[in-house]
């Protein structure tokens, strides 16, 4: 492999000749051969956006030259356009501040900027990775800013639209299924009736609440640490830098980013990420419940509940011919399990900072962005390949409805709870209908039973 010599404050390092990264990135590659999980692409792009905003702010404040800002901007745009995707090889399992990944970005942008300027790789003139790309920044404020920017962008552009689309599909189903009366179930046992539309309306409401929690979490993610520099004091940054840089990021992203009012919290804690993960976990709990309900309702086709049909997308067994499984439900619930685990990691990592800095940021970023991506993808997949094709099975719904012993609840007001319980237990013991049993016990006439036990009248207060 052909190499070139790069240097940092510890000396010279050989770097692949075609690489845009420099000495500190290469040291990290050499020292942290742990796993294969690299930092997510949205985080890389967010960090490039941070550098672009910083350059624009610094030149406006007279801290770097216009030529340097222009070159950094061009290089950052190359990153954002995907032209340098292969230049960020570092694994998650590195320094907990993300310093090596911050320097990876600084080195790549500096080398690309100097290549554009015609001075070539490793020249670091006219653009230096620390003095110009990283000007008025520390990893300690740039990296958490990138986490917030990446998470906010991904939640807004990927997750929220996916959840809304699934929510809207389920809402359409709820409206279409409104006239269909079915038996309810609690504790996996028969309960009183409701409509299939009411059942689905519960799913819609869960997702509405989930969207609300995501929007609440975004409020904290919009607060940026940039300008806190090393420990939150803003050392080596212009007094106006923090506010202007946040405003520039808001302009570049189209999202309402602001400078965090307290930089010590913004560097020392990762509470916004923990809260966002909590919202993701709660959304996962909702989606897990919805997917489980749907696969139970679709169980069968002959020996299960079978009250609804879901699309048949692929063969389900390598040995049982004709078997089809609820695969979208299974994929969704596996995603939810992963998100639950990610939340545990993020919670522990967020709680483990010391004094002025949290040093678990790469693992927080990795798990947070994975949860966002997986939930968004899973909602899109579940919506497209399952939810839109859900259809009721009226004959199965009607069978269970009229064979349920819990219709006896409608008799409470007429014959009392204890007598109604006697009817249900006797009917079950003798394998007879509720109507027949109530008449045999002398508690009601058949006509009275028919007037009282009307499933369609049991789905609302009366």
From Swiss-Prot:
Q: What is its main location?
A: cytoplasm
Gene3D superfamilies annotated for this entry? Fumarase/aspartase (C-terminal domain), Fumarase/aspartase (Central domain), Fumarase/aspartase (N-terminal domain)
List of catalytic residues: 187, 317
Q: In which pathway does it act?
A: Carbohydrate metabolism; tricarboxylic acid cycle; (S)-malate from fumarate: step 1/1
One Pfam family in the UniProt entry: FumaraseC_C
Q: Which GO terms describe its biological process?
A: fumarate metabolic process; malate metabolic process; tricarboxylic acid cycle
Which molecular function GO terms apply here? fumarate hydratase activity
Q: Does the keyword Cytoplasm apply?
A: yes
Record site: Important for catalytic activity = 330
Question: Organism's domain of life?
Answer: Bacteria
Residue positions annotated to bind substrate are 97-99, 128-131, 138-140, 186, 318, 323-325
GO CC terms: cytoplasm
Q: Which reaction does it catalyse?
A: (S)-malate = fumarate + H2O
What subcellular compartments does it reside in?
Answer: Cytoplasm
Q: What is its EC number?
A: 4.2.1.2
- Give the UniProt keywords, A-Z: Cytoplasm, Lyase, Tricarboxylic acid cycle
Query: Which cysteine-cysteine pairs are annotated as disulfide bonds in the entry?
Result: none
Zinc-finger: present as a keyword of the record? Answer: no
Please share what else the UniProt entry notes about this protein.
Answer: There are 2 substrate-binding sites: the catalytic A site, and the non-catalytic B site that may play a role in the transfer of substrate or product between the active site and the solvent. Alternatively, the B site may bind allosteric effectors.
Function, as annotated, reads: Involved in the TCA cycle. Catalyzes the stereospecific interconversion of fumarate to L-malate.
* Similarity comment: family membership: Belongs to the class-II fumarase/aspartase family. Fumarase subfamily.
**Quaternary data:** Homotetramer.
Report the protein name in the record: Fumarate hydratase class II
Q: Which organism is it from?
A: Neisseria meningitidis serogroup A / serotype 4A (strain DSM 15465 / Z2491)
């Amino acid at each position: 492999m052909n190499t070139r010599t790069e240097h940092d404050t510890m000396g010279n390092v050989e770097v692949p000749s075609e690489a845009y990264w420099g000495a500190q990135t290469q040291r990290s590659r050499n020292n942290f051969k742990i796993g294969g999980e690299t930092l997510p692409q949205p985080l890389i792009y967010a960090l490039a956006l941070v550098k672009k905003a910083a350059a624009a702010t610094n030149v406006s404040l007279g801290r770097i030259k216009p030529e340097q800002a222009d070159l950094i901007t061009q290089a950052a745009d190359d990153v954002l356009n995907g032209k340098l995707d292969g230049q960020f090889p570092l694994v998650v399992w590195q320094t907990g501040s993300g310093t090596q990944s911050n320097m990876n970005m600084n080195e790549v942008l500096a080398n690309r900027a100097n290549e554009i300027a015609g001075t070539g790789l490793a020249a670091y003139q006219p653009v230096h990775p620390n003095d110009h790309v990283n000007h008025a920044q520390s990893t300690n404020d740039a990296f958490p800013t990138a986490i917030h920017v990446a998470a906010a962008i991904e939640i807004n552009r990927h997750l929220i639209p996916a959840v809304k689309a699934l929510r809207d599909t389920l809402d359409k189903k709820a409206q279409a299924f409104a006239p269909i009366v079915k038996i309810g179930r609690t504790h996996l046992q028969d309960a009183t009736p409701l409509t299939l539309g009411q059942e689905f309306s519960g799913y819609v409401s869960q997702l509405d609440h989930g969207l609300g929690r995501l929007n609440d979490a975004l409020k904290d993610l919009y607060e940026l640490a940039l300008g806190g520099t090393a420990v939150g004091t803003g050392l080596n940054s212009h007094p106006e830098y923090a506010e202007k840089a946040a405003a520039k990021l808001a302009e570049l992203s189209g999202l309402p980013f602001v400078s965090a009012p307290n930089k010590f919290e913004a560097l020392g804690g990762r509470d916004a990420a923990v809260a966002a993960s909590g919202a993701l976990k709660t959304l996962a709990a909702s989606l897990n419940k919805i997917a489980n309900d749907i696969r139970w309702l679709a169980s069968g086709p002959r020996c299960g509940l079978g009250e609804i049909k879901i699309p048949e997308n692929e063969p389900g067994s390598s040995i049982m011919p004709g078997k089809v499984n609820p695969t979208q439900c299974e994929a969704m619930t596996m995603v939810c399990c992963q998100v639950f685990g990610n939340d545990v990691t993020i919670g522990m990592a967020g709680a483990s900072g010391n004094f002025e800095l949290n040093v678990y940021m790469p693992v927080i970023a990795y798990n947070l962005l994975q949860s966002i991506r997986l939930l968004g993808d899973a909602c899109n997949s579940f919506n497209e390949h399952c939810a839109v094709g859900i259809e009721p099975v009226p004959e199965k719904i009607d069978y269970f409805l009229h064979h349920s012993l819990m219709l006896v609840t409608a008799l409470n007001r007429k014959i009392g709870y204890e007598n109604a319980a006697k009817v249900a237990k006797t009917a079950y013991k003798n394998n007879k209908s509720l109507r027949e049993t109530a008449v045999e016990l002398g508690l009601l006439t058949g006509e009275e039973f028919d007037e009282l036990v009307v499933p369609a009248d049991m789905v609302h207060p009366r």
